[in-house]
Every structure is written in C-alpha cells, then in structure tokens.
Amino acid sequence: VNCSVDCQLQVFNWSCPSTPSTPPPSTPTTPTSSQTTTPSTPSTTSSKSTPSTPQSTSSKSTPSTPPKTTLPGCLDFDPPRQVNETWWLCNCTMAICKYDNVVEIVELECNPPPMPTCSNGLKPVRVPDPDGCCWHWECDCYCTGWGDPHFVTFDGLYYSYQGNCTYVLVEEITPTVDNFGVYIDNYHCDANDKVSCPRTLIVHHETQEVLIKTVHMMPIEVEVQVNKQLVALPYKKYGLEVYQSGINFVVDIPRLGAQVSYNGLSFSIRLPYHLFGNNTKGQCGTCTNNTADDCILPSGEIISNCEVAADEWLVNDPSKPHCPHKGLTTKRPAITTPGPFPENCTVSPVCQLIMDSLFSQCHPFVPPKHYYEACLFDSCFVAGSGMECASVQAYAALCAQEGVCIDWRNHTQGACAVTCPAHRQYQACGPSEEPTCQSSSPKNSTLLVEGCFCPEGTTKFAPGYDVCVKICGCVGPDNVPREFGEHFEFDCKDCVCLEGGSGIVCQPKKCARGNLTTCEEDGTYLVVEADPDDKCCNTTSCKCDPKRCKAERPSCLLGFEVKSEHVPGKCCPVYSCVPKGVCVHENAEYQPGSPVYSNKCQDCVCTDSMDNSTQLNVISCTHVPCNISCSSGFELVEVPGECCKKCQQTHCIIKRPEQQYIILKPGEIQKNPNDRCTFFSCMKINNQLISSVSNITCPDFDPSDCVPGSITYMPNGCCKTCIHNPNNTVPCSAIPVMKEISYNGCAKNISMNFCAGSCGTFAMYSAQAQDLDHGCSCCREERTSVRMVSLDCPDGSKLSHSYTHIESCLCQGTVCELPQAQQSRTRRSSPRLLGRK
C-alpha cells in the first residue's frame, strides 16, 4: 500500500518466492482485529469490535537479500512507522505497520454493549469511545437536593441534613479542572431553627463565580450574579453559560458536559462519568456507582452516616460567623435534628400525589420512596410553608427527564400553584430551551421542564427578549414586536421592519420646513423648540427675555421709587418715579409714624399727610416736655447744652425692709436704731455716691465666765465685755464637735475634736529686769492621726477623702508678742516706769 499524490491508498498484490531467508508474505485475507474496552468501574460498559477482512498486502520481494536480524519498518510513510505500530486513518479504519512498508488495514465494527444498572436509578447514557468509533454506557453523576433540605447523592443514596452554613456539594478529589466546585448556602427556614433550606447555589469555574440567589420566597424570585455583579440572562463568557430553562436557572459548562440548575427550592448537578467518575467529594458523594462510599469525610475516611459526614464539608463564609471554620480543633456544635414526627402532625395531601396513580407511569423509571418520605417530613416540620411542594416538584422534574410528563400542580388545590406573567402561560412539560424566532429547533428540544412559556400560537422573539410574538418579525429597542414590512416611528425616526439583515432600519424623521422669523422688538429673541403637535419636529418663535431689554431704570429722588408697568403685548416694562409715601429730612427717609430727629428740644414724627407740592409726607413737631420734680435724694440741676434740667443724685438712698428708706449725705454715718451692731454710711468717690451697710462681728462671749455685775458694752456699743472670773477656767483639752467636711462638691458631717481651754499665760513686772515679764502657752494638738472618710456626692456616688484628726491636746509654750501699737505704747511708757522707780 502506498499513498498517491492525491493522498489516496494504492494497493499492489504479487506473489513472493518462498525461501527460508525471507519472511513469509502476507496473504490476501483480513486479519482479525478486535478491541475491547474494559470498564474501570461498574458504571460503564463498552462495545467490542469484530474482525474484518484485510484489504491489502504489499509489496517488494528480494530473494537474493540475505536474512536480516531486524525487520525494517514502514520508513516511506510520513512520519515513519515502526514494526507493529498502529495509527488511525479515517472512518474507524486502523493501519498496522507489518514490516518493510507493508501496512495492514483493519476496519472496526462495534457490537452494542450490555446496558448496566445505575445505582442512582437513572438510565445510563451512551458515550463515544476515545477512538470515536465505538461507544459505551456510563452512569452520569446526578445529585439533587430539595426542601429543607433532602439529598440524593451521585450514586442514589438518600439522606437529610439540617445545617445552616455554607457547604461543599462537589469538588474534585484530584483537580483536573481549574477552580471547579459547586457549593450551597443554607439557612434556618422555620421558627424553631430546626430545619434549613437552600438560599444560594454557588458555582466556581476557572475565573468565574456564579451565585444563583433566592431573594424572595413567596412568590419565588431569583437573581444571578457573576463575580459579585448582577447579570442579565442568557449569559455566556469564558466557556460558561447561564440561562433560564422553565422555572430553573441553569449553569452550563459545555466543555465539561456539566450542568447545574437551581429554582429556589431545589438544585440538581449532572456531571459526565468519564470526566468526574471516582473523583468527586462533598455532600453529593463520590460518583462511583456504589452507595457504600458516599458518606466520605474531607480526610478521605468513609463512615456510615451521611448526616455526620455532611457536617464536615463546611466552607469558610465570613458572612456566617456562627459557623465553625476549617481547621478548628474544637468540637463542632451538634446539628439540631427535628426528631420523630410529632403525634399531632397532619400530613399534607400533596405528598400522597407521589404515590398515587397520577405518578404511576413514572414509578418504574424513578423510585418514589425517597421523595415521598421527604414530602412527609416537610409537611410536618415546616407546615404551612409550602415546602412539601419541593419534593413533588423534584420528583416530577426527574420524571420529565425520563420522558414522563405529569401535570401535577392542578391536583394540589392551589397549594403549589405557579404564577406566570400576564403574557405567558404555565406548562408542566415545556421545552428546556424555548424556541425563538432565531432558533426554532433548540439542541435540547427533547428535554422537558415546567415553567412559564409563550402561549400557543406565539413564539419567543429571541434569547434575552421576554417578548412573545405571533409573527416572527422584528423587535426594536422599545420591545414592541413588529411584522415584516411594518412602518413605525421610534425615537424621532421613521423605521421599518425588514426581513433579513439587522431587521429594523431607521432614518431621521423629515419635518416640514417653517418660515424663518426675525425678532425686532426690544427684549425679544429667536428660539427653536419642540412642536407641541409633533415632538419630533421643531418650530421657531420670538420669546421675551426681560434681561435683554435695553431701556435702563431711571434714578429717582429721595422719597420716590421706580415703578415698572407691564403693558399687554409689550416685552419690556415702562418705568416712572412715584412717591413712596415717606418723609424726607436731611437726606434720610422716614416711614409714617417714625420719629424724626430735628433738635434736642423738639419731638418730631412723620405723619401720613402728604404735601401736594412736594408729594412728600409732612413732619409734625412738638416741644420736649421737662421734669419739674425729682424723687428723694435727687435735685434738679442745669445741664449745659440740654433743653431741660436733669435730676441729679445728691444723697445716698438706702432701702430697708418694709419699704423704708434712709437718706444720707456724703460722709454721713448713721446707726441702725433697731440693731446696735449695724450702721450705714455714704461716701462720694470720683463723683459717684456709694452707700454701704456694715455689721460689727463680736468675739465669743460667755456671761458665765464673767464676774457678776461686770458686764458692759464696748465703745462701739455693739459687743459686750466683762471682768473674767478666774475660777471658771477650763483646762486645755480635746472637745468633740460635729463638723462638715467637703471636697470637690462631695460632703459629709462627722465628729471631730478641737483643742480649747485655758493655759498658764501671764504678764507681770520684773524688778530685776525692770520690765514686764511674760509667760505664754497655747492650747494645741498633742497627737494627731490621718483618717479616711467616705463623702456623699450629689450624683449618688461616694468619694474617699483623708483628713487630720486630733487625738489629744496639750498646753505648749510659745513666745509672747504684743501687737505693734501696744509695743509702741510700751516703749513710750517705759521712761515713766523707770522714773517712778
């Protein structure tokens, strides 16, 4: 076999001599070639090829060539091939290099492999072999969750889990895809915080993070974010697509064959086995077509309880500080399980629909047990929330994938109704990709989903346009459907809907040409504005702008003001000076009733009367009235430059209780007749009369210490004095007394001591010293101590404070000193004393 110039195989046949030194020639029979694909797990079965007849043998015969130890390969091929090397040609044809450019052609024929049983209860799917010739069965990795929430793993294991954190649904054990993972954000959705519901489905793929969030539950409202930004659907970027399919929001990664959907109540994840088999971890299990290893921990350990394992698949979520983070060594808080069904639980009749004849056609394809049990659970523990509808909805969705369409919502008495927009109708089994005018036959038209679809007889215009049209014409930026050939106006353009091309063609609207206008009147200008009868066209007119008027406002005299008058039909005002109705005096204006200063001896006022000659108001004046009498202590005196005499104070006036007054001349002192210790005085300082009331403070006086009959008044007539009785002397001692201590606004009354009493103090003449001899001692503290007291503050608090407490008193000697005046008198009297001697 050789390759021709036009890349065609040329087959040559001839007989080769039989000699021991040459290899045996190929016979024109087709060698048997078969290929068997052995599945690595029970989830795949492969087709097998059957032998076919070889098409050629080749080529040269060299009987004279001596025997060779190594057979030459097919060196004439590009690239050169070695002996027994195989390569694919086309149409499932394989070439085998036999020796020395001899090539064997083998055609593969595939036998259908036996259909395996998938542990998740779904039908296996046909998957092409890597060679593209044969195919094999695989059980797709399909995980779903719904309600509060209930899970069915990739391998079909059912369990419920009530965590309210963010968890890993699926990640790769050994990463083969950059940053791939699916995560679920749960929250407590009942009043007792015992059950949880899904809130956000999160999909990671390479550089993108997709969040499908439930923003409102009844009715369900969902939004989609990509990398924390809201996006419109359909969205397609970097190998990832997000679109709405019925009531579901789908994240599709075509390169991986991965699909993730979420509708606010349930989610599903479908992954191809040949890419993700034996390589998944998380709450969705391991995808091995074996439920025994689904309850796997992040450490790789397999346990028997999936609820316990699910609690370990936490995702660090800063928005949920109550959730433990990865790497914590402390014991995780136990998940609160709802416990057994309450005795008073009334099961919703919606759940019985799953087991009734309504779904009987689906029972052979999808076992209903798990969905029925989940529905009972939700109707008891989240009663009245409509959560039981999620179980029926999830089961009906799987039935639709198996081709069994069930319109079940009409049998729930409105408990699970779906509300559609006015321009759409609910269908239990519509196309997963709704047909549009641009694509009438979507690639997944055989898949069925429930949702809100365009009514019969209408078609969705295009992806991203929520517009249903009867005739596939055009939809412009106003979202109004148009028929082909229809003319319409939009954005001041004349548009037409055309078949083909961009669809809508628009041209600027043509307006009638108006007459040019010139504006000659003062203050007017030309303006172009929208025509009130046709907003797309303009009209020209003259408008008035007072700021453009050239006539200046006149300057008016005092007492007059400018008046502007608008004449009908004129743009600019007419100005004139009119009286303001005021008085004018010395270049100042006065309002009627206001005083007008003329001179000191007149009181003038502006009147309402107008002088017809000047058109100004008249000023009326009267002489200023003068005082003719003054109150006590004051006298009328002449004031230079004033019209009237002024009352000037000449005496001090002291007001006493009971409306009594004492009048004193400057320098006069008067005692209070009712109180010997109080006297009044009047002084003149810097021409100001200052009165004062003085009180004499007397020293302590105890009549019991006096010689009887010796009590007299001091010269001031206020204080008493007497001859001291020496027999009543009290010795120096510590005397207790109640006294208030205050500090920083806080105070308290406490008992403290003070020193008082008589000590041996004397003064006598000394003949030896020829002077007075003094002996002085004071009653002073002998021992003291520092004590603490708790003061009461106005705000109710306490303040600790220290003070000195006198423990005992003692007479202590001191130097006797006389006042300065007495010392002077003593010095003056000394000579007389010396003289007497």
From Swiss-Prot:
Q: Enumerate the residue ranges of region (5 X 11 AA approximate tandem repeats).
A: 17-70
In what tissue types does this protein appear? Answer: Coats the epithelia of the intestines.
**Start and end of every VWFD domain?**
141-324
State a single Pfam family of this protein. C8
User: InterPro entries from the entry?
Assistant: Cys_knot_C (IPR006207), Cystine-knot_cytokine (IPR029034), Glyco_hormone_CN (IPR006208), Mucin_vWF_Thrombospondin_sf (IPR050780), Ser_inhib-like_sf (IPR036084), VWF/SSPO/ZAN-like_Cys-rich_dom (IPR014853), VWF_dom (IPR001007), VWF_type-D (IPR001846)
* VWFC domain: residues covered: 472-543, 581-648
- Predominant cellular place of this UniProt entry's protein: secreted
Which cysteines are cross-linked by disulfides?
C143-C284, C165-C323, C189-C197, C732-C779, C746-C793, C755-C809, C759-C811
The record's subcellular location field reads: Secreted
UniProt-annotated stretches for the region Disordered: 17-75
**One cellular-component annotation, GO:** extracellular region
Q: Where is this region: Probably important for disulfide-bond mediated mucin polymerization (link domain)?
A: 149-837
The record's subunit annotation is: Multimeric.
Q: What is this protein called?
A: Intestinal mucin-like protein
